[in-house]
Amino acid sequence: MSKLWSGRFAAGAHPSAERFTGSLAFDRRLWPQDIRGSLAWAAALERAALLTPAEHRGIADGLARIRDELAAGTFPFRPELEDIHTNIERRLTELIGPTGGKLHTGRSRNDQIAVDERLYLKDVCAAVGDGLREVQRVLIDRAAQGIEMAMPGYTHLQRAQPVVLAHHLLAYVFM
């Protein structure tokens, strides 16, 4: 199977170069965002009359099946396809035929990865925020138990005046 970028080359890349440049091991975690971005793009293509409603439905149904396969761990990854985007696109074309290729109308790989990364970061930042709020909740609960508990305060890594544990813990809540 030829690579997307292989049109001008007489021979394939050396296997070590393929291992070095392949990103599937890293970007496979982007599959939820890749599916979301592709669903949104397919809807935009239909609104622009570049896909018929039936083509849009077919793409959406195919992407839903791929999402289910990925979530269940049954998706047939093909490392020779290099990245998650190409794996999903090829699987979509296998499932629904040539209409799957229309999904990239007006969208470059750079557009696709930029969307995927932004969606991924948005999702991860939300999860980090949830985790931080949980840490704050635990610190507040522990501070409530340490209202009268003294501990040494530090200045320039030297023990200084005594402080209340609750005050010390609540300082971390507001950092």
What are these regions (language model features)?
Residues M1-M175:
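A helix-coil-helix interface module used to build multimeric assemblies
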